[in-house]
């Protein structure tokens, strides 16, 4: 099934209105350490607000688009698959731990895919009133509050390798085993001086929200974002925004330039007139032969 550009633009506008409804729920909540439950450990938190936002989003989307599939973080089942059908992929609150701690890097992420390819993306941070949107073939845009909408990227220059790069990277919730060891290797190799076997990159940033970080990559404000262990709802909306801005997402493991939406390993690269391929290969060289256990569902 395909939708016309006008239909996709209409869908995007509807997603923006739904995202702003969700934003009101998020900003009206007052989470504390007494009302959250740990999913896996204290670094992976789910709140009642997640569920409330997702229920609202699902109801609104099903009412308007009853035949489209829906995949949401809070209602996901382990046997659920993303098919070729038109599918909404939703993270009601990306940056839940930030939300609980009052750190305003929090967003609602509403993605739409057709044929498992990012087609529409809406990412809204209600605390900073920042909105990122994209429709396939129509470009990507950023708007803060009532300011004029700006086309992405906001900044663009050649990529000049890892040395001068500002890289988004996260520890994730695995703090032992091979996944943690790979994170540790990548972190330390990027940070170390060249004299001690590292790449001595300009800066590493842990924001706590994959969607927001990928949008910053799309804006040209960060050069790369790497994480293994993410889910499709963490990246689907921002992926469309990055693509439309002229950036790209490749596999978080070396070798695959066109990973599936549910790959669970992602390396995002900002828009640039040159240097994208070279910086990807340089980053993959940091990973080397080590691998995480994450990958698309079998």
Predicted regions, residues:
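Oxyanion/phosphate-interacting regions
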Residues: 2-12, 16-17, 23, 185, ...
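N-terminal subdomain of lithium-sensitive/metallo-dependent phosphomonoesterases centered on the IMPase/IPPase/PAP
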Residues: 1-93, 293-298
